[in-house]
Amino acid sequence: MHISELVAELGANLGISLQMSDAGTCRVIFGDDAVDFEQSGETLYIMAELAPATGREDAYARLLAANWLGAESGGACIGLDEEKNSFALWATERGDVPYPEFEARLTLFIKALRYWKEWLSLPAAEPANQT
């Protein structure tokens, strides 16, 4: 399916009318989680903010390890949005994608989003004492 068809089908399955704006964007709220969709050519970017990065230097190593080959990120990528100074999760879909594959990857994305938002909501780890 083409990007516009994927988005429309997602909306139909959620029971809402959903389409990309003239700017090629839309946002869907899954519970408490905002997920942004942005089209650029034949690529659909799926993005969500995880948490502010300020004061979370303790999280960088863990997030990098989780990001390695998508092992703990549902196949998505964890990064730092420098403009917002926040950790973000993002994935892409390219070209024609069967809807069931898109939905399965989106489900993994949302599960990863919720896991990392919860993990990042925990208090920052205390630095280890160096002797």
Language-model features: locations:
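Short, internal acidic amphipathic alpha-helical interface segments
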Residues: 47-83
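Short, aliphatic-rich beta-strand segments
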Residues: 87-91
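Charge-rich, low-complexity N-terminal segments
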Residues: 1-34, 71-75, 79-81
